[in-house]
Amino acid sequence: YIVFVQTDDFASSFRLFNVLNSRGLPLSNADLLKNALFESASTHNKKSEQIESAWSQIEDMVGVRRLDKFLTLHKLSEKKDRDRVLQKGFEAFIENLQQQFDGDAIAMSLMLVNSAKNYTKILENDFEHPSIRRKIASLSNLGVDEWIPPVMAFMNRMARTEDFNLDDFSQFITAFEKVYMHGWLKKQIKSQREMVCYSALVAINNDMPFDSVINQINQHADNSGFIAALDEDLYEPRPNQVNLIKAILLRLDMEQQDESVIKTYTGRITIEHILPQALVNEYWINRFQPQEHV
C-alpha cells in the first residue's frame, strides 16, 4: 500500500516523518536543511530547481553518508571566535540563512556547493601545486579531521575574495603544518592541539590580512618544546600515536623524493621502509657519519 500524508507546515511534516519513518531513524541535519532551503525559496518566490541542482552536486561530491560530517566541518570553518562550543545542528544553518543570506536559499546553496568542492579537494588531495599536495598528504596520514576546518576556511575565502592567492595558500599550509605538528610531537591533548586551528580560523574569518594570519599561527610555535620532544619516547600503543609515527615516517620519506612524487605504501609500514639499516642511500650518507647511524 502507498499512504499519502499531508501536513499544514514543514515543522509538522518533520515531526510526522520521525514518527512514521520506516527506517526508525530521525531526519538528519542535511535532510532538515535541504527542506528548509526549499521552504525559503518558496517563501521568496525563487525557483527550486537551482536548489535541487546545487544539492545534487553536494551529494555527488560528498556522498549522502558524509553529508552531516561535511556540514559540521563547514560550520566549524566559519567560526570567528575561539569558543569551542559549536552551535549544533539545523538551527545554526537557519540562523545563517536569515542573517548572512537574508533568506536567499539559492545563494546559500551555491556557497555550500563551493565549500563542498573544497572539502572534497582536501579529502582527495586533488591539488596540482606539489608543495600543497605534500602537506595535505602528511596531515591526512594523522587520521583525524580537526585540521580540516582552517584549511577549508582559507580555501573558501580564496574563492569568495581576492585577498589570497595560490602562493599564499602554499605558505599558509606550510606554516600551519609545522606548528600543528609541534602539538602532536609534544603529545598535547586534542583541545591543546586545536588551539592553532582556532587561531587560524579567527584570523581568516575576521578578514585579517595574510601576514596577520601567519602571525596568529606562528604564535603557537614551540621550537624548543619540539626539539625536546624528539628526545622522548614517541611510541605508545595508542591509535593516535601509531598514526603519528606512521605520518612522521611517511613525511621523512617524502622529503627524500622530488616534490612532485608522493609514494603510496600498502600493508604494514616498518621503520626499515624509511630509515634503512644499511647506510647506502646518498640522502643519509650526506647527512650522517657511520658512527651516528649506528
Regions inferred by a protein language model and the residue ranges of each:
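Short cysteine-rich loop/turn motifs with clustered Cys
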Residues: 246-269
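A cross-family structural signal marking well-folded subdomains
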Residues: 30-34, 38-249
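Long, basic N-terminal domains or extensions that often function
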Residues: 1-2
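Noncatalytic, beta-rich nucleic-acid-contacting surfaces in large DNA/RNA-processing enzymes
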Residues: 202, 258-259, 274-275
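Histidine-centered nuclease catalytic patch
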Residues: 263-294
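Flexible loop/turn segments at secondary-structure boundaries
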Residues: 9-13, 24, 277-279
